[in-house]
A protein has these predicted regions:
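Surface loop/turn motifs at the tips and blade-to-blade linkers of beta-strand repeat domains
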Residues: 39-42, 49-51, 93-95, 104-105, ...
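Conserved strand-to-loop turn within each blade of WD40 beta-propeller repeats
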Residues: 63, 72-74, 107-108, 115-117, ...
Length: 325
């Protein structure tokens, strides 16, 4: 009988399903940055997201629903109003009273956070308008993004390197930021400074899940179809070629397969995406890496270490626990 191996997926800043009992086992000590926290502070942590190029920044929430940040603060990504590093946890007062539903981050890094009420806040690196506030100035404090989203409730967020996606409760996708390869889905390669609804083939579809790669984007609709757009120089869109796709395009190779969710996981190769078909079965879009799926231009089945992989459905309540090496 095959051993079922739970695989916690998500882009480090992506939420992962967990129960209250598993929260008690969240070992933040796996991340060196938490050595700067006292034992008392560690015991209060309820959710945590470590990000940055070297894992030198962290945002965490406490059992009292307070939000704290800590780290090098590159480009103001801690949201404290300055670019000074801090070796002591500092409360993010600008988000007082807000409960974190989900968050993601980019390479700058920039941070996109959705609250339990469906509001979107962004801050950090903004050279490519990835904050969605209409400027290219770095955001030193969380900025409420309401343009084209004022009457929308955001339920999921995703970040590429320098672009951002959000999913609303009515199944619409909005994108903004760097667009050199069409990853915003606007049909052009001009950067997008404010949220813009992704339409085209998604116009009359109800999207239930979104994900970003470095310079590409993916969406799953309620019928189980997968749509992709953006950079595909390594075949990561799964369309059978290596040409960029400036608007959403259905992945025909997945015809007849009902996909539940898609993922971009930092434990997978740089250009990889995983589509969850059902427990124990998955398909992967992947760029040129060693192994039997290297350079695949169309989806391939995924098996890790000879064991059946179960991709956990994401909740929007808990930020990812650390990968265990």
């Amino acid at each position: 009988m095959e051993e079922e191996l739970p695989l916690f997926c998500g882009e480090s800043g992506k939420p992962v399903q967990a129960t209250l009992s598993s929260l008690k086992m969240l070992d933040v000590g796996k991340w060196p940055i938490f050595s700067l926290c006292s034992e008392e502070e560690l015991q209060l942590i309820r959710q945590a997201c470590v990000f940055g190029s070297a894992g030198n920044e962290v945002l965490y929430t406490t059992v009292n629903d307070e939000i704290f940040v800590l780290g090098t603060n590159c480009c103001g990504c801690l949201g404290l109003g300055d670019v000074q590093s801090t070796i002591e946890p500092r409360r993010l007062d600008s988000l007082t009273g807000k409960k974190v539903a989900c968050l993601s981050y980019g390479s700058g890094p920039h941070v996109v956070l959705a609250t339990s009420e469906g509001e979107v806040f962004t801050w950090g690196h903004n050279a490519y308008s990835q904050l969605g506030n209409g400027t290219t100035n770095h955001g030193l404090v969380p900025c409420h993004i309401s343009t084209n989203l004022s009457n929308k409730r955001v339920i999921e967020v995703a970040c590429g390197s320098y672009h951002s996606l959000v999913l609303t409760s009515d199944g619409e996708v909005f994108a903004w930021g760097y667009n050199n390869s069409g990853q915003v889905g606007s049909g052009s390669t001009a950067n997008q400074p404010i949220p813009r609804r992704v339409t085209g083939c998604l116009q009359n579809k109800v999207v239930v899940n979104i994900a970003c790669g470095q310079m590409c984007s993916m969406a799953v609709v309620d019928t189980g179809e997968v749509y992709v757009w953006g950079y595909s120089g390594n075949g990561q869109l799964g369309l059978g070629g290596s040409g960029n796709q400036p608007t959403p395009c259905r992945v025909a190779a997945l015809q007849g397969i009902r996909v539940q969710r898609n993922y971009r996981d930092r434990s997978l190769p740089l250009y990889a995406h995983v589509c969850c078909q059902d427990p124990g079965r998955a398909r992967v879009h992947v760029g040129p890496v060693p192994g039997p799926v290297g350079g695949a231009a169309a989806p391939h089945a995924l098996l890790l270490h000879g064991r059946r992989v179960r991709l956990l459905r994401l909740s929007r309540r808990l930020v990812a626990p650390p990968h265990r090496g």
